[in-house]
Every structure is written in structure tokens, then in C-alpha cells.
């Protein structure tokens, strides 16, 4: 960012639409929704394109997503007449040639770094703010997520407009508007990622089943490394560039 701007301090009482509007107004052309094609993104896509039909959306393609996820991807692009910015990891053939079979089992941290974290870093490269579907009730690691704050891990702003929404809030919004959503949700998948690391389950218990992992690499890096130092905008917080510091802890 080259121009200074000042953010309001009362975002906790703001609606999801108001948070999105603030992001669009504050970071024109340099804010994007990170889309993983789950129910939260079904809600946010509808809200975002209602506010700005030219809004930016990006997705990480690990080449291991479910067929249903890829079909929803195409449906979203048709519905909103948009092209989702794609950031991909190595193809399965490239992974095997370089690291052998089933890297996600033999070296899961390396797989996440290659397939998710590296593409995410590229996606965030020209952004000043990114938007996610993180909700506080999804996992203990997300319980204190701010609606907007400074993401120290990536050195940009991060917005979680649905932070205070529940599962039922999301489904009510989807039903009332007849929005497309990932049909895997109807088959018991609350959280959806790669085919090899996702099983049916409530909350995030179906992700990385059989391990003690609750977050994929890109979320964990942001939530643990970044959001522990995230700040909510203070009354005199003026941002001017990516090195901006904020004054008061976002969890207070």
C-alpha cells in the first residue's frame, strides 16, 4: 500500500457484509477471497460478488481435490461470470518423480509446504488483504480469530467476516438464497480438503484423520505464527505499507 488509511475500531459488531465492504473499499484491487469451495465460501462468494462483481477470488489447486470440488469450482465461475485465480502445486507426476509415492504420508510437512504453502505465498504476493472463511467454532486453534487484523506470518491484513457465524448460520444463508455448495457436505464431510487427507466427520475432525493435525500448513502458519501477533485496529491505527504495526492485542 502506498496511501495511508485508517480502519474503524468496532469491527466485532460489524456484519460479514460490512467487513467485506471495508476490505473492498480499503484495499481496491489488492484484496481477494481465498476459496476452498466449502460452505463458508458459498456464503462469502455470494456476498462478495453482490458488493463487487469484479472482486478477486483465488484458489489453491493441489491436484488432489475431490471431483465434486472441481465441479463446484466450474459452477462458481459460471454463476458469477468470473475466473478464479489458480495457484497450483506440482502435478502428481512431478511429485512422484521428485519425492516418490505418497509424499503426504511419508513427509506430510514437506507435502504441505510444496502443495499448499508455496502456492499460497504466490497468491498473496500482490495483495494487501486476504479474506477467508475461518469461523471461531471450527476448531480450538480458530476460537479467537478476529474479523480483521494484521497477519504477521504473511505481512498483510487478513479478514474473517464469518468469524462469529455458526454452521446453521451458513446453511440458513445458503438455503434462503439457493446457493450452490459442495455436495460432499451432504455426505458427512464438514471440512473438505484433499482426497487423501479428508474423511467424513464433524468440525475439522475429518481432516488429517489418524493424526494429531487439525490444520493444514497454510492455515496453521497463519493462525499460529501470524494470528498470535495479529492486532485489531486501534483508535489511532494508521496503516502505511506492509511493515505497519498495530497497537492493541486483537484478542482483547
Annotate each language-model stretch with its function.
Residues 1-252:
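Nucleotide-activated chemistry modules centered on ATP-dependent adenylation/adenylyltransferase
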Amino acid at each position: 500500500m502506498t496511501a495511508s488509511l485508517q480502519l474503524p475500531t468496532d469491527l466485532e459488531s460489524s456484519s460479514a457484509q460490512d467487513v467485506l465492504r471495508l476490505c473492498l473499499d480499503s484495499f481496491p484491487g489488492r484484496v481477494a477471497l481465498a476459496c476452498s469451495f466449502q460452505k463458508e465460501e458459498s456464503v462469502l462468494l455470494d456476498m462478495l460478488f453482490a458488493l463487487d462483481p469484479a472482486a478477486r477470488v483465488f484458489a489453491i489447486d493441489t491436484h488432489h481435490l475431490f471431483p465434486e470440488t472441481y465441479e463446484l469450482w466450474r459452477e462458481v465461475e459460471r454463476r458469477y461470470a468470473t475466473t478464479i485465480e489458480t495457484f497450483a502445486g506440482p502435478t502428481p507426476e512431478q511429485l512422484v518423480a521428485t519425492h516418490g509415492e505418497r509424499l503426504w504420508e511419508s513427509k506430510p510437512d514437506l507435502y504441505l509446504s510444496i502443495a499448499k504453502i508455496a502456492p499460497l505465498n504466490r497468491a498473496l504476493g500482490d495483495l494487501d488483504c486476504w479474506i477467508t472463511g475461518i469461523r471461531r467454532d471450527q476448531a480450538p486453534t480458530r476460537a479467537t480469530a478476529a474479523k480483521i487484523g494484521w497477519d504477521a506470518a504473511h505481512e498483510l491484513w487478513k479478514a474473517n467476516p464469518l468469524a462469529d457465524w455458526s454452521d446453521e448460520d451458513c446453511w440458513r444463508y445458503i438455503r434462503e438464497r439457493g446457493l450452490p455448495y459442495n455436495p460432499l457436505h451432504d455426505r458427512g464431510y464438514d471440512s473438505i480438503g484433499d482426497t487423501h487427507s479428508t474423511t467424513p466427520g464433524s468440525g475439522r475432525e475429518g481432516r488429517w484423520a489418524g493424526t494429531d493435525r487439525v490444520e493444514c500448513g497454510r492455515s496453521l502458519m497463519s493462525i499460529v505464527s501470524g494470528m498470535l501477533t495479529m492486532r485489531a485496529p486501534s483508535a489511532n491505527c494508521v496503516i502505511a505499507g506492509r511493515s505497519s504495526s498495530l497497537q492493541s492485542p486483537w484478542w482483547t
